[in-house]
Amino acid sequence: TNSITHSFTLGHDFIVNQLITTSIGLGYSDADAKVDAGNDYETYDGSLNINFAFPWAYISVGNALSFNDYKKADSSVNSSIIRSDVTHTFDIMVTKAIGDFFPAIDPNRSLFINASYEKMKSEANIMNYDYIADSFSLSFSKSFNLNN
């Protein structure tokens, strides 16, 4: 790998009722590039998710903020400025058992379809690193028990 990273994360999940849960997270990471071209940085993260366990689907809506502080000036743009940026991420995910649509294929309802959308907006003190990105994802997952 090109870098060594150490991170710490603290999270708390809270059950409001049978339908609603929340997740709060705080994190810190320190990345050090092996070949040091100014890509050493520290990241501070905070996130909040609210989750809904509806009978017809599981929906999660989240918001996160990440603050990146680089340790060396970026010589590719301006050698006197140390890069610092903040990234705001909004995401929504919907999960549904395939067995709810096709009981013959998944009678135990252990095969899931997941659809998600993520919007990231990053602002830096160096304009070259400002961006807005949208991401869509569709995936399938299978749950199974290792004790059987």
Language model segments and positions:
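Gram-negative and organellar
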Residues: 1-148
